[in-house]
Structures are given as structure tokens and as C-alpha cells.
Amino acid sequence: MSRPLSDQEKRKQISVRGLAGVENVTELKKNFNRHLHFTLVKDRNVATPRDYYFALAHTVRDHLVGRWIRTQQHYYEKDPKRIYYLSLEFYMGRTLQNTMVNLALENACDEATYQLGLDMEELEEIEEDAGLGNGGLGRLAACFLDSMATLGLAAYGYGIRYEFGIFNQKISGGWQMEEADVWLRYGNPWEKARPEFTLPVHFYGHVEHTSQGAKWVDTQVVLAMPYDTPVPGYRNNVVNTMRLWSAKAPNDFNLKDFNVGGYIQAVLDRNLAENIPRVLYPNDNFFEGKELRLKQEYFVVAATLQDIIRRFKSSKFGCRDPVRTNFDAFPDKVAIQLNDTHPSLAIPELMRILVDLERMDWDKAWDVTVRTCAYTNHTVLPEALERWPVHLLETLLPRHLQIIYEINQRFLNRVAATFPGDVDRLRRMSLVEEGAVKRINMAHLCIAGSHAVNGVARIHSEILKKTIFKDFYELEPHKFQNKTNGITPRRWLVLCNPGLAEVIAERIGEDFISDLDQLRKLLSFVDDEAFIRDVAKVKQENKLKFAAYLEREYKVHINPNSLFDIQVKRIHEYKRQLLNCLHVITLYNRIKREPNKFFVPRTVMIGGKAAPGHHMAKMIIRLITAIGDVVNHDPTVGDRLRVIFLENYRVSLSEKVIPAADLSEQISTAGTEASGTGNMKFMLNGALTIGTMDGANVEMAEEAGEENFFIFGMRVEDVDKLDQRGYNAQEYYDRIPELRQVIEQLSSGFFSPKQPDLFKDIVNMLMHHDRFKVFADYEDYIKCQEKVSALYKNPREWTRMVIRNIATSGKFSSDRTIAQYAREIWGVEPSRQRLPAPDEAI
């Protein structure tokens, strides 16, 4: 029998380190050991750092699975209305740290790995990003999944398990080069294959009309096999599911050829079926009408709807029948949210199932479909709107085309009855667009087939009602809503900026993590010298850490005391990275003109990927790197100005750069950025914003107060007026000497001496066909940047403004966004109730 502990020995257990929970740490170490040996079949003599990462991932995952099973059992028992979020993109990033944060395991895992002689941060860096998205739309879906779990909604994310996610960007000779993102090379410890739920998806074939109704026959079948990933809520023991579909060829695929000796070819041709989820299309805000992309869109929709209906039929429903056969209650038990038009085929597919397979009459089926579906619009750029050629649909999905024609006919009959004699309105509102190539307008299909249509920021939702969807708003104003986007504070504050989260928690407690409006309490600390000092200190630490990262990974040296001026987002003309470039060159010219004058030192960092086929976006990257080559090697400039292109911008890099930012660039032409979410991440992490009155910037400035925001440039009305008058870049070129100098430098090869005409396409675009009016905002932008520099010279005032921004960023939590979707679109009530943990009695 061991001797009892002395009082002093007992007291030694009271320590900060002890907070991890000693039995927890011991248990984690034991499980880590078990997974290393029994799951990975390695010992310490041959284990690599990657093996240690996998062992840790499996150890953490063990804490998810009990909660995951318990959550699904809870949903089966309670049979709540289920929310299905359909998206072609889920830009999840890394999972390990997020899971530890949401399960309150971070301290214990840190201690356990430390005791095992490992560095948890190094292990976290080994994980590949799940890059199954291009940018904002896919990342929004990921934030929404986190919030739906945190709010206790019975929600499921449905998408595609792409074998290759968004390409890895390499910069070579100043140009973007794309490399395949082989994110599954070493396996994915977070997913669970579910081959037992494999479902058939049909393509091609033709339609037979019988006395029983329409039959789609002689189709090619591809099997959809689901992979499930757990999505934990924040410390509430809820774990929801993201189900991503992969493709398999059926066993008899093309084997009729076998009899004539084509066995080998038939087996090789299985690849054609399995190509569907091979790669994410890397276009952001651009529609490319490729057959494979249409196959992807139908593939996810067809598999998901079968799954939804299977779950609906087999759920508890207070009746003795083995399955539910009555679809009257379907819209009361199922909500389908379409993330943009990419999953729009859900509307005709649900109609096909109800009418052709469930033998429901058209009007009833249509009522069920409309009450079930809702559509989120993400862009007003005409080149981004999906318009599928009829000939493609006719070949690939002949029955769906017939259903779309029928939907259109009935819809136009309603329009004609409401607006008699208005023929042009019928043409404008038709789902079918006539022209050289007949097309189906998928946004029109979504509006007709949904009970709710929403934009993603107040100004964007207003633009939808006044411009591109004006006719539809006049027909059915009750359908149109706004749901301003948000971000999850778990990943975008607690995980990426623990120093700031801690400083905040010391003042107002930890409840803000799942109730971000509580940040308002920080307004009473705006004049608190200790708090001002703490916030500034955390920012400086983050800047030093990021500077060290750049030095380590890219051998790039930057001045950590300079103003970190950051623009990170997809490279696109409408986001106006070119305006940023013009400012950088202007600043450079000013330093060269007055080398002895004091300039606030700046490090301008720009990052983002260009679509591989987008010539102008790739030229913009080449320009940024060329400016950097000149500026960074000019001894006159020294440490006062640096230009860095951040290679391969992705979720895991944004988690490093955003907490280090001083200035956030949100400078799209007013009326073009639907919302933006990067803007919110910077605001929450203590950067100030320079931006136009566009997207969510408008609401951010409203929350913080315009005096705490660097607003510049034309408003939407000004852009409209300029369009009416006719935008003439030459006017600005002639009138503004500094602008003229910059353009002359670009034209003359100042930044490309070996190839003087390298940037002629950029100059030509800016001078003659710039849809996004860069010159019109140049002067105001430069003046606004001068105000930024002036304030940065006063660190106390700068930090006070930062605190006001952080304190008013609560509105931009995705928890608020999702609570609004739940109440106003899905008809469900969010719940903060904690489920019992797996080791607790129910």
C-alpha cells in the first residue's frame, strides 16, 4: 500500500500544467502509443514525423467517434427537421487543431506530445489542407458546417470528394505555375468510407413515355460511394456529418464488350466513370460549360437526393409502416440549401423522383419541391452565372431537360397571368435563353424552384432585387431575403490567434467564443492602457512570428516593425489587385523622389491564385512579382517598402498571415463583391480596413463607425452614374501626374527591362476596357492610404481604433448567419443545449 501524500505533495498537483487533466494526458499518451503501433504498425525506430501526426490524429479522432455516434442516435430518436447543405465546394483546410479546440483537448494534447518529446505545432504543420474549394464560397460552406454543429442543428454537408483539390501554386520566374494537389497521397485520417451506402447515378440514355408515365432508360450507371467526415460543434458534444461522394464504375461496366474480346478495354474504360470526382474545377467567379463539370453537378445532386429520401423514409415517424411512403411531410422534415447554382439540378431531380418514381401528380410534387429548396446567390458578375447549353443537357440528362421545359412553361404561364401583354418580360424571365446556342439559365431555375432566395450581404441582396433578379422580385417579393455572411470564431480567432483570444478572455471571460456579440463589452476597454498595451503586444508577436515563417520557408526578410499591408484573395480584375499595385509604385516613386524624407515603412503582401486559364489574372501576378524585384533590390528604398507575393495562399497560410496584418485591403469596385469574408477575418484579428463601400464592408463600417474605417472610392450609385456618362480612363491619365508616371513606367518596361512590352496587355486593359474602373478610384485611394500612414505613426490611437473594430465584429460570426437561416428559411430553432458526453448517461 502506497503511503498517503503529504499536504505539500498534494498541493504540487495544483498547477497550471495540471489543468490539462493528468488522467487525460496519461490516456492520450497511451492511445497515441497504441495507434502508432497497432493502427500505423510502426515503432519509434522507423516512425517518421508524419507517422506521429497520424497517431495524434487517430488519438484525437477517438474522442470524436463516440460523440458522433451519440449525435446520430439522438437525431434518430428525436427526428428533427434535417438541414442539407449542398455545395460543390467545402474548403475545410486542416482538421486536427480545429477538432482539439472544439473538443477542449488542445492543452492535454500539447502536454502529452511534449511528454513524448514531440512538438505539437510541428505535427500540425504536416497535415495537408483539404483544399476542396476555390475561395470564399467553399470556405463559407466550411464555416457554416462548424456553426450548424455549434447551434445543435441536425445538418449535413453534401459535396464531392475530389481526388485533386485546388492546385498548388508555385511561382517560377515570376509566373504562376500549377501543380496537382495530391492531398490524399498519404491517406486521410478524418474520413470514414461508407461503401455500404453506395448508390447508382444515371447518365445519358433516353426517355420512354408509357401509360405509367415517363421512364428514363438505357442509361450509363456510375456508383456514388460516400466518405463521411465528422464535424464537431464547439464544446457541446454535437458531431455532425459532412458526406462527400466518390465515384466507382459498376462491376459490369462495359462488359458486354467482353464477348467480342474487349475485356481488357472494358476494365480500362472504368476510369471514364471514375473521372467524375477526379479534380475540382479551379474557376472562381467564371462559368466554364464543360460536360465533366455538369456531370459533377448532377452526380452530387443525384446521390444526395437518394440519400435524403432514404433517410426520410426510414426515420421514426409514429406509424407502423416499415417505411414512410407519404411525402406530405417532406418539407417539414427536410430543408435543402443550394450553395449557388452549382447544385441547381436538385430541383428537376427532386421533381423526377416525385413524379416518375413516387407517382405524385405534378402540382403536388412542385409544391413539395419549392417548400423544400432554398437558393443562395453569390455573385452578380455576368460571366459567373451558369447557363448550360441545351444540347449538353439533352445528351447527358434528357429527362431533366424535359422537366425543366415543363417547369418553364408553367412558370411563364404564371408570369403572363400576372403581367398580361408584357412579352419582353417573358423573354427576360424564361429559364430557356434563345440565341446562337440555346441555354438554360440555372439562376432562373433556382428562383422558380425555391421558397427563399438570398444574397450574402445587405447591399448585394438589394442589388439582386434592383438589377439582375428585378423581374423575379416583382413577381414574388416574399421570396427574397438577405443573409449577411459570417465566419466561425473558433477557427478565425481561437485557433489562429490564441494570444488575442486569451487577452480578450482575461477581460470578458470565454463566452464570446460561442456568442461573439459579447465582444461589445470590449468597448469599455478602449481607454484602458493595460488592454491597449496587451493588444499591441499580441499583434507585434504575431508579426514577428509571421516574419520568422517567411524567412524560414521562403528565405524572405521583412521588417517586422513596418506596417503589414495585406491583400489576400483570389486574383481577379474585380478585386483590383491592380489598384494596390498602382499605389505601391506611387509610393516607390515618392521615396525615389525624396529619399531623405521620412516614410512610414510598409511591407505590402499580396497573395492568391489565378484561374489557370485566366490570362489577365496571371499577368497581374507577374506584375506583382516584377514590382517586388525592382523595389526590394533598390538600396535607396531599403526597409521602407517591401513587396512580397505570398505563394500558394490557402486556408492554413491565411491562419498565419491574418493575425499578423495591420491593414486589410478590401478594394473591389463598389457593386462587384457580393460579401467577402476575408474582410471579417481581418477585422476580428485586429487589422484596420481600407475598403470601398462594397459587400460586407458596408455593414462592417456601420458596426464599427465610419470614423474607424478607411473608406474611399465610388459608391454603387457613383459607379452607375459613371457607366451612364461613359468611363474614360484617358481623363484620369491626363489629369493626374502621378498616375501618368506609373502607367508610363509599366509601358516603357521599367519593371521588365528584359521584355519592355511585358505588361502591354495590362496597360491596354486599364486604358481602354477596364470594366472595374481602377483609375476612377486611384486618387481617393492614394489619399486614403496617406491617412493610414499618418495614423500608424500614432501607435496608441491606431490600437484604440483596432479595439473598436474587434469589439464591433460580433455581427460577423457565422453563428449569427446560421441562426438567421435556421429561423427565417429552414424553419428550425437553433439550440445551445449540450448533448451528454459519451461517458455520461442520456
Swiss-Prot record:
Site positions (Involved in the association of subunits): C109, C143
SUPFAM superfamilies in alphabetical order: UDP-Glycosyltransferase/glycogen phosphorylase (SSF53756)
Any one cellular-component term (Gene Ontology): cytoplasm
TM spans (from-to) = none
Transferase recorded as keyword: yes
User: What role is this protein assigned?
Assistant: Allosteric enzyme that catalyzes the rate-limiting step in glycogen catabolism, the phosphorolytic cleavage of glycogen to produce glucose-1-phosphate, and plays a central role in maintaining cellular and organismal glucose homeostasis.
Name of the protein in its database record: Glycogen phosphorylase, muscle form
**What organism does the record attribute this protein to?**
Macaca fascicularis
